[in-house]
Structure formats: structure tokens, C-alpha cells
Swiss-Prot record:
The entry's keywords: Aminoacyl-tRNA synthetase, ATP-binding, Cytoplasm, Ligase, Nucleotide-binding, Protein biosynthesis
Domain of life of the organism encoding this protein: Bacteria
Organism: Thermotoga petrophila (strain ATCC BAA-488 / DSM 13995 / JCM 10881 / RKU-1)
Assembly with partners or alone: Tetramer of two alpha and two beta subunits.
Name listed for the protein in its UniProt record: Glycine--tRNA ligase beta subunit
NCBIfam families: glyS
InterPro entries: DALR_anticod-bd, Gly-tRNA-synth_bsu, Gly-tRNA-synth_heterodimer, tRNAsynth_Ia_anticodon-bd
Length: 672
């Protein structure tokens, strides 16, 4: 079996594109191997800060053969009355370099069917590699040189080989060779003898091409540091992945910052060191003043360590100054400064947003029937939940928004429950009741406000993260088991920005509810569709979905779904639920009516307790009565009064079922 290599050398790639490039390379390599009929091959991709590519292993000598078919003239045109080939058939064969041996008859036409031999693999690999390189998509491609080419970064070299032979490949005006390049400033050109020795060759030039090997190398150095120092480093996966993305030969740097900065809140220290210098803080029982960073290149000289220390000390000195200044300003005064900070141009200032959050939170407290004393805590938290955005520390370190609000609130002696909620309401899954209420109110205000001014997300663009905010609302409601009307909250929030609840906004939330059920709760597509109309009261929709998911596979319920479909289909164009039992002529009508009243009472009581499983058990009691009804009662009679009366009665049954779910979506499953 043969092995091939493709390496594309570029200027430094943005770390934000690392995972996208990696995923695309993996998917495209697999797709192209199949498309080029090299199905036995396997792909091992690699991405570094200045290169990416793939090693293809287990390649055959040639592509797989395939059978080619081409449609020709109809049989009555291809042969004369004596069954001999006509000029039309002869011309078709001549044009396709084929003979009568290649002809098959099918569906009244001539078809050419012949085996096409696969080409030698070295002949097709250049096209495969070209398709791979040019088929990658990037968020912000750029042009370089004469502007003729567009790519993620300017390309400087290409290595393309199969075994020890260089492939004939040209991309971006560059011809492939066996020459790669090592770490900038530490190594020059590197001759690659063959794909099998690619990784080994580059290591001599201080490049670890494999991202998996780089990650392993980083973790090994952290392990070694911990053993040597007796300290611990938190394995921050996000930071480790970023280091792997921006380095080609990561080497550990250990330094220390001034101990006086340990007086700062831990969150400030970690943020200044991690987010702004891509470094880890070492722990013993508590935070230490030792940090661990990673330099790209061979063992760093002493001045590199001093450089890290100088920059980190400077960042922490700035943070200390901002923190001390902030302590001079109470949160209440910071909140007043929000009047000078625009939330969004057409939605006013952040102060205006806080006022809306307070009103939505108060309305939510009313819906939840919370005690007045607790509501006051919620409103107190709401009034200062964005105050720290006006602080100097958050201006310098935006990722500490909410965190600093909690810290400043505790420093002022504000109730811990309220202080915690300031940070908690930003969480995707708030851990406190106050944080959950503020989290819903904040997100509803943002979503409604953006829809009001025309910032509506699409399938490909959601710059304000409205989809994630909607998902978080459903998540919070489910976690707290709050039976609230989301529709009423949206209507109320809309009135605060001079907006009316639109069909567009309702469609958005219905769509997000469906995605939430399927993607987060693992609800099947058909069940999610069956309860999607219940998004207006999300907890009920969720509980109904979970109950339907559980029982929908049971045989006794399949018949129920079919019975409901008969009722639903015949009443779907009838809106009224009015009927008069005195007009019933058949005994089956009266029996179904009496059973309906009995079942309805039990179903409604079960739904009051939010027990959807019990409600479904009651609904199944209607099944034999519905079957008997349709076997003996003709609904669509000519007499208007009888027909309308029967439809009105059946509409009552339809609406009772719809309180649990639209089971027509589940009938399809039962018929598979």
C-alpha cells in the first residue's frame, strides 16, 4: 500500500479558525477519497499555526474500476425492422468509442455499459489535493500579491508527495516540491524524503505538525512542572486548545509576578493572566504568584521569562489601580452611569434596559406567585444587575461582567443572595432563583428588542446570539419547573419597547423550542413536532414531549394515535366547539359524549397537576368509543344542523387531545 502527503505552508493562521480547518480537512478528505474511488485509503490530518495538510495511508496502486453507463437512442430508432443497427446507433457507438458488445437494452432505450479502469493513484492525487485545498471555507479570506488569489492567509509553499515521489501539483501559482520549512528564526528549509518520515523530519526543525502530538507535549510539560514544583495547574481545556492552535513547538515558561497582586480577587488575577497572556496560574492550597506560559520555539532564554513577568506585572498593576478606583464608587452610582452607555441605538441606554429588566422580572414574580418580600429581593438585584458594566475593571476585562458586580456588591455589604444573582443571571444555567428570574427577563428583553428594530436572526447569521438566548430561556424554565406563559411574557416585554408580539417572533420561539426538544432533551423529531404548538407554555410542552416519547412506542397507544387522526382530520377546517347533545340521533353519539365528559374531567385534573402520563392514560379510554362512533355515524351529512353539530362535538375531542399533543405526527410512526 502507498502513502501520500499534502502540506500547505502559510502565514500565521488565526487561532479562531483552527477547529474549523481541522474539521473541514477531516470531512473533505474522507469525502474525496470516496469520490476519487480510493475507498481503501484513510486520512490523518494535521493543523499548525503555519501549516495544515493530510497524510493519506493505505492507498492502492490504482483507483477502483467503475461501470460507466450512458443513455442512447430509443430501441425503435436504434434498429431497423430487420433488427439491424441503424445509422443512429452506429453514430452513437462511434461518438463514444464503443461497440455493440457494450450495448444493453433497458426501458425501451439503448444504454452503453462498460467497465472503466481506474487510473494510477499518482495521476489522480494532484486533482484530489487541489480539490481539498480549494474546497475549504473561511470566515474572512484575504487576497495577497496581485490580488488574484483569495485564501485564509497567503500561501508560501506546497509539499505534495506519494511515497518518495513529488506529485505534479500547482496551486496559487506555486508548484509542489519536497521542501518544507521549520520554525521561523530557528530552522530553515527541510527536505522531506517521504510521507512516512514527514513528522520526524519537521521535528528536527522545531515543528510538531500533529496537533495531537502538540497537545500531548503541552500536557507532559505541565505534568513535569507539577512533579518538580509540588504545585497544581488547572487543566483549562479552552486555554490548552488555544496554545496548541497558536504554537508549532510549545515550550514551557515558568515565571512569577509580584506577590502584592495576590491581594486582588482571584477572578481578576486569573483573567489578566489567562485571557490576556494565555498563561496558567499555579495553585497550592490557594492561588500562588507562579504562572506557566508556553513559548513557541526551542527552550526559551532567560529574557523571555523576564518579558512574560514584566508584561503580567504591568497588567496586574493596571487591574489593581482600576479595582481600587472602582471601590470608591458604589454600585448605585455605577448604575447611574449606565445612562451614558448605549445598549443599542434604537433601544436606548443600558439604564433603560435595566428598567425594562426590572419590569419583566416583577411580572415574572407575579406569574410565579412569589411572596412580596422575595419579589423585593429580585427587584433590588435587577436594579444593579448591569451596574458593573460602568466599572473600570469590566471596561478593561469585559469577561468579568457580572463577576465584578458580585464582588462589589459583597464589598458593600449587600445581601449575598442578591450579590450572587448579579453574576448568576448571565449563566446559561443559573443556580439561584433570583438569577434565573433575571436571566429570563434579560434575555427576553434582548430578543424582543432586537426583533422590534429588525435585527432578526437567519439560518446563517445570528450576530446578537438570540438563538442561544432563547434556548437558555427554555433551559431555565425546565430546570426550575416553572409553569409560566412565555407568550404573555413576550407580549408584556414587547409593550415596553413599543412593539406588538409578531408572528415572526412567535415563529422564532416555536422553532427554537423544537430545536431545544430535539437537540438538548433528545426528543424524537415526530414527538417534537407533535408538541411544538405548546411552546407558549414551555414546561407543559416539555412534560408532554417526555410523556409522549415514553409511551409512543407502546402498541396500545398506536391505535389511540390513529383514532385521534380521524377526529383531527375531519375537524381541522371547523373552528367552533358548539354542539347540542339533544340533536344526537345515534346511540354511539351519546355514548361517546358521556365518555368524553368523564374523560375530560379526569384529563384536566391530571394536566392541572402537570401529569401528562396520567392524562394520556385517560385519553386512551376514548379509543373504542371513537372507533364505534365512526363505524356507525356519518358526520358529513347533508343536513347542515346535524353536520355542524357533529363537527362541533368532535372539535371538543380534538382540542382535548391537542392539549397533550398533535398526535397526527405520531400516526406515521405507527404505520412504518
Amino acid at each position: 500500500m502507498r502513502t501520500a502527503l499534502l502540506e500547505v505552508g502559510l502565514e500565521e493562521l488565526p487561532a479562531s479558525e483552527f477547529h474549523s480547518i481541522l474539521k473541514q480537512l477531516e470531512e473533505r478528505s474522507t469525502e474525496l477519497l470516496k469520490a476519487y474511488r480510493i475507498s481503501s485509503g484513510s486520512a490523518e490530518v494535521f493543523v499548525g499555526s503555519r501549516r495544515f495538510g493530510v497524510i493519506l495511508k493505505n492507498l492502492p496502486e490504482r483507483q477502483e474500476d467503475f461501470t460507466e453507463e450512458k443513455k442512447g437512442p430509443p430501441l425503435n430508432v436504434a434498429y431497423d425492422e430487420n433488427g439491424k443497427p441503424t445509422k443512429a446507433l452506429e453514430g452513437f457507438l462511434r461518438n463514444n468509442n464503443a461497440s455493440l458488445e457494450n450495448v444493453v437494452h433497458r426501458e425501451g432505450y439503448i444504454y452503453l455499459s462498460r467497465v472503466v479502469e481506474g487510473k494510477p493513484v499518482e495521476e489522480v492525487l494532484p486533482d484530489l489535493f487541489r480539490d481539498l485545498v480549494l474546497g475549504l471555507n473561511f470566515r474572512k479570506p484575504m487576497r495577497w500579491g496581485s490580488g488574484e488569489h483569495e485564501y485564509i492567509r497567503p500561501v508560501h509553499w506546497i509539499v505534495a508527495m506519494v511515497d518518495g515521489r513529488v506529485l505534479d501539483l500547482e496551486i496559487f501559482g506555486l508548484r509542489s516540491s519536497r521542501i518544507s520549512y521549520g520554525k521561523r528564526y530557528h530552522a530553515g528549509s527541510i527536505k522531506i524524503p517521504d510521507p512516512e518520515r514527514y513528522y520526524e523530519s519537521l521535528k528536527k526543525g522545531f515543528v510538531i505538525s500533529s496537533h495531537l502530538e502538540r497537545k500531548k507535549f503541552v500536557l507532559e510539560q505541565i505534568d513535569e512542572f507539577e512533579k518538580r514544583s509540588g504545585m497544581k495547574i488547572e487543566r483549562d481545556e479552552e486555554l490548552i486548545e488555544e496554545i496548541v492552535a497558536i504554537t508549532e513547538y510549545p515550550r514551557i515558561v515558568v515565571g512569577q509576578f509580584d506577590r502584592k497582586y495576590l491581594e486582588l480577587p482571584e477572578e481578576i488575577i486569573v483573567t489578566a493572566v489567562k485571557h490576556h497572556q494565555r498563561s496558567f496560574i499555579a495553585h497550592k492550597e490557594t492561588l500562588t504568584n507562579t504562572f506557566v506560559a508556553f513559548q513557541d520555539g526551542p527552550q526559551p532564554p532567560e529574557n523571555v521569562v523576564k518579558g512574560y513577568e514584566r508584561v503580567i506585572n504591568a497588567r496586574l498593576e493596571d487591574a489593581r489601580y482600576y479595582f481600587q478606583k472602582d471601590l470608591e464608587t458604589p454600585l448605585e452610582k455605577m448604575n447611574e452611569k449606565l445612562k451614558e452607555i448605549v445598549f443599542q441605538e434604537k433601544l436606548g441606554t443600558l439604564y433603560d434596559k435595566v428598567e425594562r429588566i426590572k419590569k419583566i422580572s416583577e411580572r415574572l414574580c407575579e406569574d410565579l406567585k412569589l411572596p412580596e418580600s422575595f419579589t423585593q429581593k429580585v427587584l433590588e438585584a435587577a436594579s444593579i444587575c448591569k451596574a458593573d458594566i460602568a466599572s473600570k475593571v469590566v471596561y478593561e476585562f469585559p469577561e468579568l461582567q457580572g463577576v465584578m458586580g458580585r464582588i462589589y456588591a459583597l464589598r458593600e455589604g449587600i445581601n449575598e443572595e442578591i450579590a450572587t444573582a448579579i453574576e448568576d443571571h448571565y449563566s446559561e444555567e443559573p443556580q439561584t432563583v433570583i438569577g434565573s428570574i433575571l436571566g429570563i427577563a434579560d434575555r427576553i428583553d434582548t430578543i424582543v428588542g432586537n426583533f422590534a428594530i429588525g435585527n432578526v436572526p437567519t439560518s446563517s447569521k445570528d450576530p446578537y446570539g438570540l438563538k442561544n438566548k432563547a434556548d437558555a430561556i427554555f433551559r431555565i424554565i425546565r430546570k426550575n419547573e416553572w409553569d409560566i406563559s412565555l407568550e404573555e411574557l413576550l407580549t408584556f416585554a414587547s409593550s415596553l419597547v413599543g412593539y406588538r408580539l409578531s408572528e415572526e417572533l412567535e415563529t422564532f420561539f416555536a422553532g427554537r423550542f423544537y430545536q431545544f426538544l430535539v437537540n438538548e432533551l433528545g426528543i424524537s423529531f415526530d414527538v417534537a413536532r407533535a408538541v411544538n404548538h405548546l411552546w407558549k407554555r414551555p414546561l407543559r410542552g416539555i412534560l408532554s414531549a417526555e410523556a409522549l416519547q415514553e409511551i409512543s412506542e407502546k402498541p396500545e397507544f398506536q391505535d389511540l394515535f390513529v383514532g385521534f387522526e380521524r377526529v383531527h382530520n375531519i375537524t381541522k377546517n371547523h373552528d367552533s366547539v358548539r354542539f347540542d347533545g339533544a340533536l344526537f340521533e345515534k346511540e354511539e353519539e351519546k355514548k361517546l359524549m358521556n365518555k368524553f365528559y368523564e374523560v375530560k374531567e379526569k384529563v384536566l385534573k391530571a394536566l392541572e397537576r402537570l401529569n401528562y402520563r396520567e392524562a394520556l392514560q385517560y385519553l386512551i379510554e376514548l379509543k373504542p368509543y371513537i372507533d364505534e362512533y365512526f363505524d356507525n355515524v356519518f358526520v358529513m351529512v347533508k343536513r347542515d344542523d346535524l353536520r355542524v353539530n357533529r363537527l362541533g362535538f368532535l372539535k371538543n375531542i380534538d382540542e382535548l387531545f391537542m392539549m397533550v399533543g398533535d398526535m397526527t405526527y405520531l400516526v406515521k410512526r405507527s404505520q412504518v
